[in-house]
Amino acid sequence: MDRLKEVVEKTGKKFMYAENFVYATPVQKAAEIIRAKKTKLLFMKGEESLKGSSSPVAGKWNKTGGGTLMRTGTHPMGGMLWLKQQEAAARNEEITVQSVSCDVGCATRCLTGDEHRHIVAQPEDVEDYGVISVTFSDGTKALCIASDTVLGGTKNYIEIYGNNTALNCNITPTDLLNTYFLDEDGLEDVEISEMLPAKLGWNKAFVNDEIIRGYMGELQDFMEAVAYDRAPASGFSLAYETTKVIYAAYQSAEEGRRIDF
């Protein structure tokens, strides 16, 4: 990573890290509030969980680079690290990651074939559950949860607890549109939400999720960074920190100890 950092700095090219959690509309609003109030972030909790990936290679280390921690945990982790960067800039402080502790496992291994029918995850040599505890240099904390064992759709959020505010960023699901259906007639081509096998009963429908989840803001920021020759909001420093934390987390889980920086 340090060699890559050298290349980026020497070439003067723009490195754009596609972390949609940074650009998710509730996270962007939370960042605005944190900067305005100069909030000290004491504890954050973020999660991305679902019933497993639709990718046939998600369960293979040599195809994916890890399990649910790598596939989904990077998103809330990256979002929380970015928020910590916003806090540091607003308060004119330098805040770094001090230590990482992690536990991973394969919770679905205990299921019979019939019991497994609702869970898509098929881990071979990767984890289907992971939790990371991060301690920052100012003594504050962040907790990241990632799991392939959660039914009911995709669960994405960041909870923020500071000295002068509490902010809950609900990315998915949201309450913009709650739907109730007794049947699915006429709904064959209507998308309600992700990772739900049926549309019956009450559901929390996706409404402009490409905007709320940050995909549009991400692309707009990257294009404007090129057009106006400025740095993107999500760049190399965030990619570097996120990768460092994720790999330290795997080392922590493997060795059964806290990793200090």
Per-region residue spans from a language model:
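C-terminal "lid/loop" region of Rossmann-like NAD(P)-dependent oxidoreductases
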Residues: 194-210
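A general structural signal for well-ordered alpha-helical segments in protein cores
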Residues: 1, 27, 76-77, 219-220, ...
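Contiguous beta-strand/loop segments that form the cofactor/metal-binding neighborhood of enzyme cores
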Residues: 78-181, 216-229, 248
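C-terminal helix-rich "cap/oligomerization" subdomain common to oxidoreductases
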Residues: 5, 10, 186-187, 207-208, ...
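Mobile, glycine-enriched helix-loop/loop "lid" segments at the mouths of ligand-binding/catalytic clefts
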Residues: 45-47, 103, 173-198
